[in-house]
């Protein structure tokens, strides 16, 4: 249905706000499932004048537990979501090695994924995802980078400026990763 997107930037740069807006643009006839950790920031259910939901949205939250058998983490929710035939999956933020690879693999299986990650630039976003995944998985850098480029063809980099405003600074399309070089097309650069 769509193209997977990773929105990157530092804390306070507007990643979640932009992601929420993008997800709000998903047509009402498409099934949207969000996964968030800790607290719910997305409210994407649209209602008619009588208060009835007019779109198909499911919001899910992780639930940590001291008992590992009762822990409901992002990875477990993502595994379950894939069986629910989503048109679009919104994953609040990639923070761990496990999440970085499992979210990427979901995108590579034909699901449209929108997610966020902390990084310093559009280009460094792919390397950030790769190094996050590398913490747990012993895979060659080249393979991990190719996975990330395939999983997220589009990277949007956001930044909070000195005056406090938040802006999209760059949008790139990752094309490939060969011989240690990210091959990408800069779609917008401010």
Q: What spans do the regions from the language model cover?
A:
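Switch/coupling sub-region of P-loop NTPases
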Residues: 2-11, 21-149, 159-160
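Conserved lysine of the Walker
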Residues: 15
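Conserved small/polar residues in nucleotide/adenosyl-binding loops
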Residues: 188-190
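Hydrophobic positions on the alpha1 helix immediately C-terminal to the Walker A/P-loop
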Residues: 18
């Amino acid at each position: 249905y769509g193209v997977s997107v990773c929105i990157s930037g530092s804390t306070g740069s507007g990643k979640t706000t932009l992601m929420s807006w993008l997800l709000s643009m998903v047509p009402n006839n498409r099934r949207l499932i969000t996964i968030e950790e800790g607290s719910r920031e997305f409210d994407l259910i649209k209602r008619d004048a009588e208060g009835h939901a007019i779109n198909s949205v499911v919001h899910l939250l992780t639930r940590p537990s001291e008992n590992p058998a009762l822990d409901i983490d992002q990875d477990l929710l993502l595994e379950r979501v894939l069986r629910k035939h989503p048109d679009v999956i919104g994953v609040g933020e990639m923070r761990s090695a496990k999440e970085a690879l499992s979210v990427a693999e979901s995108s590579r299986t034909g699901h449209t994924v929108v997610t966020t990650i902390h990084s310093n630039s559009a280009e460094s976003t792919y390397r950030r995802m790769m190094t996050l995944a590398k913490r747990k998985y012993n895979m060659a850098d080249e393979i991990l980078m190719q996975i990330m480029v395939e999983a997220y063809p589009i990277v949007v980099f956001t930044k909070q400026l000195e005056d406090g405003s938040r802006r999209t600074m760059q949008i790139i399309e990752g094309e490939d990763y060969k011989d240690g070089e990210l091959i990408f097309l800069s779609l917008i650069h401010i």
